[in-house]
Amino acid sequence: MRSDMIKKGFDKAPHRSLLKATGLKDEDFDKPFIAICNSFIEIIPGHKHLNEFGKLVKEAVRAAGMVPFEFNTIGVDDGIAMGHIGMRYSLPSREIIADSVETVVNAHWFDGMICIPNCDKITPGMMMAALRINIPTVFVSGGPMAAGKTSKGEVVDLSSVFEGVGAYQSGKISEEELKDIEDHGCPSCGSCSGMFTANSMNCLCEVLGLALPGNGSILAIDPRREELIKEAAEKLKVLIERDIKPRDIVTEEAIDDAFALDMAMGGSTNTVLHTLALAHEAGLDYDMSRIDAVSRRVPHLCKVSPASNWHMEDIDRAGGISAILKEMSRKEGVLHLDRITATGQTLRENIAHAEIKDKEVIHSLENPHSEEGGLRILKGNLAKDGAVIKSGATEVKRFEGPCVIFNSQDEALAGIMLGKVKKGDVVVIRYEGPRGGPGMPEMLAPTSAIAGMGLGADVALLTDGRFSGASRGISVGHISPEAAAGGTIALLEQGDIVCIDVEERLLEVRISDEELDKRKKEWKRPEPKVKTGWLGRYAQMVTSANTGAVLKVPNFD
């Protein structure tokens, strides 16, 4: 066993002595040592229940004849961090999580790992670590939150609260109505109830094969999640016995399948960023052109909030992720069904008995929302290395208009609230990319303000930053190269005409190459917003969004 490095041989007597101080007995040194990588944090509702959850995982690991050791990672609640300096720390926290998990697990030579993530950057951070460490691993997330209901019976979620702010600001609802939405938008523990980033990543984790069937959709408060815990411990033991590791599971084909589900469900645009980072950790050469190829062959079968009033509980009721995959598998060339997963079985075996139980929630191949996926990769002179739009969250497929430029999210939100943005405008929020932000903050507050004011179909928004999974409308993010790197978005001037064509996958500014070259020569990079601390280091090390915004390793040659 891998853990023999710290427990076998006469020279490991000091190690065993220390381990006995934690409560271990001599007989425990013949069992696999399992890292329980938890993320219990009281300020994050998606993680509030994970302390008790971790206890159940440890019980299941002991029952399976293994020895559990629990530790916790950090985490950032993107909703609470939204709209202020806290959002700059969100994406960088992914790297800290990956590094911290790698540190604990490799320092102590664990034989296997069960990861308990739930919210936005915690899930991809742990997945990156699992691929980096590459020991048998099973993920079992904390589960989605239920949707809420206002006193009038209206179904609401976190995106409803954000949009309620814009609606109140524009006089569309009263302060009492906003308070009603606020009080009921997040009714329980769990990851926010729509197809936002957390649930998108937990669903993708299931499809990749690192998590068990049901992981993405079973609610946090559902007793079936306890059964999932027990099964996770049993399956981990099998993975250890068969030496099946994350890099055996997360192949290029598995990533294709993860993006295929993403396209079928219209997941968060953040999945592109995180899954490219996973490919990097797995040592795979996977780029945005391959994502676009998946988008072209996968129909959009589900619309989940913010694209509709359906939530994760409805997906679960309709058959879960397995039912969506089973329906997708009817179309030749969409899924790779014979690859191994954390169950020890193939994807084909995992979904064999799944079926759609509600075709209003999960559409059939014969009745898709659209023939192509709910995410699109756009390119053009404004995004030479690519940009991403959640096409399933807008009915508008082509938009052209003059740009209104803001050099930060705060500046943009203030401008929107003051009425500086009109119908037909293209809002540009720049210098918010991985380097420029720094940290590539999400633009949920501006998109929600625009939607809440009733301009969601009449105003487009472009940024080198990110969007929350709760964002909707004509929102194009991840524009690469970013402004801080001298990308075309940095060269835009007030009133320039921008064209967004979703069907043609085009993002262009209507000015000549000669004019762009002239502006590029005159452009000067602004001073970094942050020069010290973690964010200062991050800004110097981070790469572009089109490569997953991973950190570059210095060249020591």
Swiss-Prot record:
<feature type="modified residue" description="N6-carboxylysine">
    <location>
        <position position="121"/>
    </location>
</feature>
<feature type="active site" description="Proton acceptor">
    <location>
        <position position="468"/>
    </location>
</feature>
<feature type="binding site">
    <location>
        <position position="120"/>
    </location>
    <ligand>
        <name>Mg(2+)</name>
    </ligand>
</feature>
<keyword id="KW-0411">Iron-sulfur</keyword>
<dbReference type="GO" id="GO:0009097">
    <property type="term" value="P:isoleucine biosynthetic process"/>
</dbReference>
<dbReference type="InterPro" id="IPR037237">
    <property type="entry name" value="IlvD/EDD_N"/>
</dbReference>
<dbReference type="InterPro" id="IPR000581">
    <property type="entry name" value="ILV_EDD_N"/>
</dbReference>
<keyword id="KW-0460">Magnesium</keyword>
<dbReference type="InterPro" id="IPR042096">
    <property type="entry name" value="Dihydro-acid_dehy_C"/>
</dbReference>
<feature type="binding site">
    <location>
        <position position="119"/>
    </location>
    <ligand>
        <name>[2Fe-2S] cluster</name>
    </ligand>
</feature>
<dbReference type="InterPro" id="IPR056740">
    <property type="entry name" value="ILV_EDD_C"/>
</dbReference>
<keyword id="KW-0479">Metal-binding</keyword>
<dbReference type="GO" id="GO:0009099">
    <property type="term" value="P:L-valine biosynthetic process"/>
</dbReference>
<protein>
    <recommendedName>
        <fullName>Dihydroxy-acid dehydratase</fullName>
        <ecNumber>4.2.1.9</ecNumber>
    </recommendedName>
</protein>
<dbReference type="Pfam" id="PF00920">
    <property type="entry name" value="ILVD_EDD_N"/>
</dbReference>
<comment type="subunit">
    <text>Homodimer.</text>
</comment>
<dbReference type="Pfam" id="PF24877">
    <property type="entry name" value="ILV_EDD_C"/>
</dbReference>
<keyword id="KW-0456">Lyase</keyword>
<keyword id="KW-0408">Iron</keyword>
<dbReference type="GO" id="GO:0004160">
    <property type="term" value="F:dihydroxy-acid dehydratase activity"/>
</dbReference>
<keyword id="KW-0028">Amino-acid biosynthesis</keyword>
<feature type="binding site">
    <location>
        <position position="442"/>
    </location>
    <ligand>
        <name>Mg(2+)</name>
    </ligand>
</feature>
<feature type="binding site" description="via carbamate group">
    <location>
        <position position="121"/>
    </location>
    <ligand>
        <name>Mg(2+)</name>
    </ligand>
</feature>
<dbReference type="GO" id="GO:0005829">
    <property type="term" value="C:cytosol"/>
</dbReference>
<comment type="pathway">
    <text>Amino-acid biosynthesis; L-isoleucine biosynthesis; L-isoleucine from 2-oxobutanoate: step 3/4.</text>
</comment>
<dbReference type="InterPro" id="IPR004404">
    <property type="entry name" value="DihydroxyA_deHydtase"/>
</dbReference>
<comment type="function">
    <text>Functions in the biosynthesis of branched-chain amino acids. Catalyzes the dehydration of (2R,3R)-2,3-dihydroxy-3-methylpentanoate (2,3-dihydroxy-3-methylvalerate) into 2-oxo-3-methylpentanoate (2-oxo-3-methylvalerate) and of (2R)-2,3-dihydroxy-3-methylbutanoate (2,3-dihydroxyisovalerate) into 2-oxo-3-methylbutanoate (2-oxoisovalerate), the penultimate precursor to L-isoleucine and L-valine, respectively.</text>
</comment>
<keyword id="KW-0100">Branched-chain amino acid biosynthesis</keyword>
<keyword id="KW-0001">2Fe-2S</keyword>
<dbReference type="GO" id="GO:0051537">
    <property type="term" value="F:2 iron, 2 sulfur cluster binding"/>
</dbReference>
<feature type="binding site">
    <location>
        <position position="192"/>
    </location>
    <ligand>
        <name>[2Fe-2S] cluster</name>
    </ligand>
</feature>
<comment type="similarity">
    <text>Belongs to the IlvD/Edd family.</text>
</comment>
<dbReference type="InterPro" id="IPR020558">
    <property type="entry name" value="DiOHA_6PGluconate_deHydtase_CS"/>
</dbReference>
<feature type="binding site">
    <location>
        <position position="78"/>
    </location>
    <ligand>
        <name>Mg(2+)</name>
    </ligand>
</feature>
<dbReference type="GO" id="GO:0000287">
    <property type="term" value="F:magnesium ion binding"/>
</dbReference>
<comment type="pathway">
    <text>Amino-acid biosynthesis; L-valine biosynthesis; L-valine from pyruvate: step 3/4.</text>
</comment>
